[in-house]
Amino acid sequence: KETKFLNKITKHRKLIKYSYGKKNSYIKILDIKKINDEKKITFKLKNKIYVLKTSLIGEIQIKNLIFAIIAAHLSRLKIKDILKTIHKIKTIPGRIQKIGKLKNKSKVFLDYAHTPDALKTVIFDIKKEYPLADISLVFGCGGERDKKKRPIMGSIASKFCHKIYLTDDNP
């Protein structure tokens, strides 16, 4: 959906489009391997292979990281300098942010997902990252706004989580 819309805009306005992942993309992702709490991303840029390590979680954060590399490279930064720095990027507070580890080695994440789509994305990203894990979710939909989303978010939580701790306000 997004791609068709962007293709139409870029063609109509004669803009140059940069993308990743596909055959004729600026960056082609060759492999993503999970090693402990890190990802090793192998990609191709201008017929050269590069490797990047990151602790970011989730498809959106990885996409943003790749587009940051593209933007930096298009700004004439050398790829070796980009790769020296890019691995230091951490998640934005409140966006699939790892905030702890329990005695049983369970990981604790914080995300301020406030829409049904955002909640589902977070749950799916964590499930992809830790496919064998049971997800326990603490969430609330406080305030007087947008009461219609509460049952939808509750349904998503009950469908995809092992345990739910529902609060009467934002936890």
Regions found by a protein language model. Give the residues of each.
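Generic detector of well-ordered alpha-helical packing
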Residues: L65, Y112, D169-N170
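Hydrophobic, well-ordered secondary-structure elements that form the walls
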Residues: I96, D111, I164
